[in-house]
Amino acid sequence: MSLRTSDRLAVADLVHLYASAVDDRRFDDVVELFTATAELRLPDPPRSLEPVRRHHGHDGVRTAMAALASVTRTEHAIVGEMYAPGDSLGYALGRITCIAHHWTIADDQITDLVWHLRYDDEYLRTPAGWRIHGRALTINAIETRPVRRLRAPKSDGRAADAGLSAASTEPQPRKTNPRGRSRETP
């Protein structure tokens, strides 16, 4: 049995919103993508690549995200997604593969700590839409690479022209002016 198309698309949007919000440093928005009773299970690299640390609820997710504050910039590239219905209506499972870059600057040297990882997810449909109810992050491999140059992150923590809010999975309308038209022209 497979997940309904509309549910699969909504859950996939949730996964990508998470990656985008983390990369844009919008950690309060990340928290809202989880249920109030969610469990986030994380590894403790390099000691353990398996999920051994547990964070519970919104406060736990917020604490986990605070650890990224010391990282200059991140980029989460979702490279694989598998979704399946759970054992009840409004419950779904996901296995997400990702390459996560963590760029840091120390002593004028830029380093990219790359995690090749997998998220094993549980999703719940809530009145606010689909949310992450459980996430276990497993690291499959870690690389460290020198980097020549790194674009500075935006100071306001927002993606340029992204038009998305993690709290709402709907794109926000952009105020644009088509070429050759004045704002008064319909």
Q: How does the language model describe each region?
A:
Residues M1-A36, R183-P186:
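Short, low-complexity N-terminal intrinsically disordered segments enriched in polar/charged residues
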Residues S2, S48-L49, D107:
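Short coil/turn segments at secondary-structure junctions
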Residues R8-L9, L40, R62, H102:
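Generic signal for short, ordered secondary-structure residues
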Residues D29, L33-T97:
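A solvent-exposed, acidic/Ser-Thr-rich amphipathic alpha-helical stretch
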